[in-house]
Amino acid sequence: MEPGKEKEVEAPGELNQKPRPSTRSSTTNRQPKMKRRKKDLEELKKEVVMDDHKLTLDELSAKYSVDLTKGLSILEAQDILFQNGPNVLTPPPTTPEWVKFCRQLFGGFSLLLWTGACLCFLAYGIHVNYYKENANKDNLYLGIVLSAVVIITGCFSYYQEAKSSKIMESFKNMVPQQALVIRDGEKMQINVRDVVLGDLVEVKGGDQIPADIRVISAQGCKVDNSSLTGESEPQSRCPDCTHENPLETRNIIFFSTNCVEGTARGIVIATGDYTVMGRIASLTSGLQMGKTPIATEIEHFIHLITAVAVFLGVSFFWLSIILGYTWLDAVIFLIGIIVANVPEGLLATVTVCLTLTAKRMARKNCLVKNLEAVETLGSTSTICSDKTGTLTQNRMTVAHLWFDKTVYEADTSEEQTTGKTFPKSSDTWFYLARIAGLCNRADFKPHQESVPIAKRATTGDASESALLKFIEQSYNPVSEMRQKNPKVAEIPFNSTNKYQMSIHLLEDNSEAHVLLMKGAPERIFDFCSSFLLNGQEYPMDEEMKMDFQNAYIELGGLGERVLGFCFLNLPSNFSKGFQFNTDELNFPMENLCFAGLISMIDPPRTAVPDAVSKCRSAGIKVIMVTGDHPITAKAIAKSVGIISEGNDTAEDIAARLNIPISQVNNKSVKAIVVHGSELKDMESQQLDDILKSYKEIVFARTSPQQKLIIVEGCQRLGAIVAVTGDGVNDSPALKKADIGIAMGITGSDVSKQAADMILLDDNFASIVTGVEEGRLIFDNLKKSIAYTLTSNIPEITPFLLFIILSIPLPLGTITILCIDLGTDMVPAISLAYESPESDIMKRLPRNPKTDNLVNNRLIGMAYGQIGMIQALAGFFTYFVILAENGFKPLDLLGIRLYWDDTQLNDLEDSYGQQWTYEQRKVVEFTCQTAFFISIVIVQWADLIICKTRRNSLFKQGMKNKILIFGLLEETVLAAFLSYVPGMDVSLRMYPLKINWWFCALPYSVLIFVYDEIRKLIIRRRPGGWLEKETYY
C-alpha cells in the first residue's frame, strides 16, 4: 500500500460499507433527516445487490487489498475498524418505560375519562366560586374517582404489557461470540465485534458465522440458513459461484447463520448493519406499525359517545337558557350532562375482558405481548404463514421407501402412531437398512434412553439424523449394528461428488469388507451394474432403469429429498487389515448393486390440515410464504390443504392435459405457486391481481423484502393480515403485519421482538384457537358494552328532567358512581366468559369498515329502547315513593327551587303537611336510593338479554357461572349499600321498604319479553327490517 493512501474497503451495490463520516457540530435540518430515513427504508425494501460472489479470487483479493493466505495486517484491520466501526447491529430504538406508561394513562378511552374528570373539577370550581361554603362537592368526588379509575386501569394495563416484555427477555440468550481470523499470516481468536471488512476468516462446524463472507476454500462445509432463508436442510458451501442470486449461491455464508459441519475459509465482504441480516434488522426496526383494529374501534366509540354527549349537553344548555336559568347554571348543567354520558366503568371492563382472554389464550399456547392483539387475531382475514416449523414439524423424517420395485409410505406423524408399515421381512430391506444405518455420520446424543426415538437429539445433519431415527425404529439399534460392522474407511459427502461412501468389516465374516454408498440417486445409479429384487441380485436392465426413473420422478415430485443406496461386497483380497486409501482409491468403485431409494421431507404437523380447513370455513385466506424450493412448498401446501384437492395450478393442468401452459384456461385455475424471481420484477398492480384472482397461493423462494411486499399487498386490498414466522427473514413482515406471530421454541430473538404474539408450541393449529378466542371476545365486548351503555339513559334522564321539569333530583352523582363502578362492573366482565352463540368459525371475518364494535344499532338499542324502559322503571319507583310521602307527581313540577332552599323549613306537600329542609333531603336521598335499586333490578334483565344477540336465552341457557355470580353480586352489593348503617352519611343511601324493590320488577319482565320477541322475529326473518335496525 502506498503511504497516505486509504485502503479501498467498499462492498458493491446495496451492501456498500463506507467509512463513517466525521461528526458535524452544526445542527442539521430535521426535514432532510426524515426524508433520508424514509428513503433509507425504501432502499432497504429493495433486493440485495452484490457481485462479490461472481468475482474471481484474484479480483476479490484486489478489491479488498487482502492477501488470501496471510489476511490483513493488524494495522490495516485497526484502521478499517476505526473507519467503519464495530461489527455489531445497531440496536433498534426502544420506547422508554415512562412513554409506555403515559400511553396507557392517556391513550384511547382514558382520554375521554380524563376529559370527564377535568370537566368535573371545572364544575366544582364554578360551584365553589359561586356558592362559597354551600358548594356541592359531588363533582369534586366524581372528578377524583374518574382520575383514580384511569390511573388504576392504566397501571394494570402497563403491568400486563411489562409482564409480557419480561417473558420476552427470558427468551434471550446472550453469549459472547468469538471469531477465528488470520492476520499477518497468524491465526488469532478475536471478539466478533472486531471483525472487519476484508478479514480472512476461518469457520468450522458449530461456529456462528461472524459476518457475510465470500468462501475461498471449503472442506465438507454445510451451513444452516433456516433462520435467514427458511430452508430446513443444511446447505453445502464451496468456492464456486452457483447462482446469480447472492442469497442462493453456494460461495457466500451469511452473518448469524450456523456452520453445522466441515470447515471453510473466506473473506469478509460485509459487517454489522451492512450484512444481509443487518439490513433485515434495520428494515424491521424502521417499519412503522399502524393502529390495531380494537384501537380504531375504541377511537370510533369515543367519537360516537362524545358526539352524543356534546349534542345532549349543548341542546340542554340552550334549553336551560330558554327556561330562564342563569348562564352559570346552564354551564354547570352542560358539564353535568357531558360527564353523565361518560361510562366510567367501561375502560376497566374492556381492559379486564381483554386480559382474561389473553390469559385464556396463554393456556392454549398463545402468548400475547400486547392486549389489543387479542382482538386483532379475531379480525384476521388473511394469514401469511411460513412453512418450516410452523406448518411442518421442523425435522426431516423418512417419508417413502422404494425397493423391490415398489413405493412404500413411512409413518411421518409426530407421535409415530399411524401404524403405516412396509415388508420388513424382505431381504432387500435388510440390505437397505444396513446401508442407511452404517453409511451415516449422525449419532444420538448420550443419556436419552427414556426419550422417544423420534424426539431424541442427534449430532449430524437433518437427512442423516432422519435415517438414523428411522433405522433405529424400523430395524435394529444402530449402535449395535456399528459395533458389529466397524468402519475402516470413508469418503464424506461433498457437493462435487454428491455421494458418501464408507467401508465396513462384515459381521458374519470378520475377514471380509463391504463398501456402502448413498447419495444423489442419479449419481448412485451410475455406479451400479446390478440391482436387488426380493433379496436376489440381478443384472441391470432397461426395465429397471425405467422403474428407477419413474420412482425418482414420483418421489421428487412430492417435494421430498431423495437418496439412492447401493453396496459392493469387496473381493477376498481386500481382507482385514487392508489399508484403504480414499485419496488414491486403491479399491473398486464400480459395478455396485443398487438397493433402493429413501426419500425424506419435513412433514406437516398432524393438526395443521384440520386447522387450515377451519380457516377456510371461517373465510380466512391462508397463504404460504416460504424461502424453500417451489416443489417442496407446493407439496406441503397440498398436504396441509392450502392448495386443496381439485384446485390445480396452471402447471398441473397443463401436465394432466398434456398441453402447453399458454393454452390453459385461466378461469379454471384457482391455485398458483409464485417464485421469488417472478415477484422480484413484479409491479404492485400485478401482485394485487394475483392476490385478488387466486384463492390458494404459495410464494416460494422469497426474500425477506418480498415477504414484506406480500404483506403490504394484502393490506392494500383491505385485509387484516396475520403473519407467522420464526426466522430473522420473517421479522420485517412480522412487524408490518396487523398481527405478527412468532414461534416460541424455534423462533429467533429478532422474530420474537418483532411479533405481537408468540406460539409457545410452534403449532399453526394454535393460531386457529387464537382466531376463535379473538372473534369471541369481539362478540362478548359488544355485549358487555351494550349492557354498560344501557344504564346511561336511566342515569342521564333524571338530570334532564331535573332541568326541564324542575323536580327534585331523582339520582345523585354518587349513586351513578355506585352503578358504574360498583353494581355494573362484575356483570359486565362476566359477559367475557359467555360461550359463542353459534359456530363463530363458520362465518366470514368481520369487515372493519362496516362491522364496528359500537355501531348506531347498538347505541339505538341501548339508549333508545332498553335504556328508555329502564328510565321508566326508575321514575315509576321515584314517583311512587314521593306519592307515598305526600307529594303527587303533578305537584312536583317546578318545585325544585323551593325544595333546595336551605332556609325554607315549611314546604307543604299535596296534603298540606309541612316539610323541613332536612326532612325533604331524607326523602330525596331515599328516592335516589330507590332509583338506584330499580336500575339494578332492570339491569338483571339487561344482563340476561345481552347474553345473546340472536339466539333465544332458552337455547343459550344459563351455563355461565360467572354471570350468575354477577347477578348475585350486584344484588347483594345494592342491598349492602342500602341497608348497612352509616351509608346514609357517607353515600347518602337510605334503607328501603321491601315492597319498593318490586316496583321495577314488571319493567324487568317487560325488557326480557320484548327482547325475546325481537330476537324471534330476527331469526324468523333474517335480513329483514328489524335485523337491519336492531341487530348490533
From Swiss-Prot:
<feature type="topological domain" description="Extracellular">
    <location>
        <begin position="118"/>
        <end position="141"/>
    </location>
</feature>
<feature type="topological domain" description="Extracellular">
    <location>
        <begin position="319"/>
        <end position="330"/>
    </location>
</feature>
<dbReference type="InterPro" id="IPR001757">
    <property type="entry name" value="P_typ_ATPase"/>
</dbReference>
<keyword id="KW-0597">Phosphoprotein</keyword>
<keyword id="KW-0633">Potassium transport</keyword>
<keyword id="KW-0479">Metal-binding</keyword>
<dbReference type="InterPro" id="IPR018303">
    <property type="entry name" value="ATPase_P-typ_P_site"/>
</dbReference>
<keyword id="KW-1133">Transmembrane helix</keyword>
<feature type="modified residue" description="Phosphoserine; by PKA">
    <location>
        <position position="952"/>
    </location>
</feature>
<feature type="transmembrane region" description="Helical">
    <location>
        <begin position="853"/>
        <end position="875"/>
    </location>
</feature>
<keyword id="KW-0630">Potassium</keyword>
<feature type="topological domain" description="Cytoplasmic">
    <location>
        <begin position="349"/>
        <end position="781"/>
    </location>
</feature>
<dbReference type="GO" id="GO:0051649">
    <property type="term" value="P:establishment of localization in cell"/>
</dbReference>
<dbReference type="GO" id="GO:0005391">
    <property type="term" value="F:P-type sodium:potassium-exchanging transporter activity"/>
</dbReference>
<protein>
    <recommendedName>
        <fullName>Sodium/potassium-transporting ATPase subunit alpha-4</fullName>
        <ecNumber>7.2.2.13</ecNumber>
    </recommendedName>
</protein>
<feature type="binding site">
    <location>
        <position position="726"/>
    </location>
    <ligand>
        <name>Mg(2+)</name>
    </ligand>
</feature>
<dbReference type="InterPro" id="IPR044492">
    <property type="entry name" value="P_typ_ATPase_HD_dom"/>
</dbReference>
<dbReference type="GO" id="GO:0120200">
    <property type="term" value="C:rod photoreceptor outer segment"/>
</dbReference>
<dbReference type="InterPro" id="IPR005775">
    <property type="entry name" value="P-type_ATPase_IIC"/>
</dbReference>
<comment type="similarity">
    <text>Belongs to the cation transport ATPase (P-type) (TC 3.A.3) family. Type IIC subfamily.</text>
</comment>
<keyword id="KW-0915">Sodium</keyword>
<keyword id="KW-0472">Membrane</keyword>
<dbReference type="GO" id="GO:0007283">
    <property type="term" value="P:spermatogenesis"/>
</dbReference>
<dbReference type="GO" id="GO:0009566">
    <property type="term" value="P:fertilization"/>
</dbReference>
<feature type="active site" description="4-aspartylphosphate intermediate">
    <location>
        <position position="386"/>
    </location>
</feature>
<feature type="topological domain" description="Cytoplasmic">
    <location>
        <begin position="163"/>
        <end position="298"/>
    </location>
</feature>
<feature type="transmembrane region" description="Helical">
    <location>
        <begin position="299"/>
        <end position="318"/>
    </location>
</feature>
<dbReference type="InterPro" id="IPR036412">
    <property type="entry name" value="HAD-like_sf"/>
</dbReference>
<feature type="compositionally biased region" description="Basic and acidic residues">
    <location>
        <begin position="1"/>
        <end position="10"/>
    </location>
</feature>
<dbReference type="InterPro" id="IPR023298">
    <property type="entry name" value="ATPase_P-typ_TM_dom_sf"/>
</dbReference>
<dbReference type="GO" id="GO:0006814">
    <property type="term" value="P:sodium ion transport"/>
</dbReference>
<dbReference type="GO" id="GO:0030641">
    <property type="term" value="P:regulation of cellular pH"/>
</dbReference>
<dbReference type="GO" id="GO:0030317">
    <property type="term" value="P:flagellated sperm motility"/>
</dbReference>
<dbReference type="GO" id="GO:0097225">
    <property type="term" value="C:sperm midpiece"/>
</dbReference>
<feature type="binding site">
    <location>
        <position position="730"/>
    </location>
    <ligand>
        <name>Mg(2+)</name>
    </ligand>
</feature>
<feature type="compositionally biased region" description="Polar residues">
    <location>
        <begin position="19"/>
        <end position="31"/>
    </location>
</feature>
<feature type="topological domain" description="Cytoplasmic">
    <location>
        <begin position="948"/>
        <end position="960"/>
    </location>
</feature>
<feature type="transmembrane region" description="Helical">
    <location>
        <begin position="782"/>
        <end position="801"/>
    </location>
</feature>
<feature type="transmembrane region" description="Helical">
    <location>
        <begin position="97"/>
        <end position="117"/>
    </location>
</feature>
<feature type="transmembrane region" description="Helical">
    <location>
        <begin position="928"/>
        <end position="947"/>
    </location>
</feature>
<dbReference type="GO" id="GO:0016887">
    <property type="term" value="F:ATP hydrolysis activity"/>
</dbReference>
<keyword id="KW-0406">Ion transport</keyword>
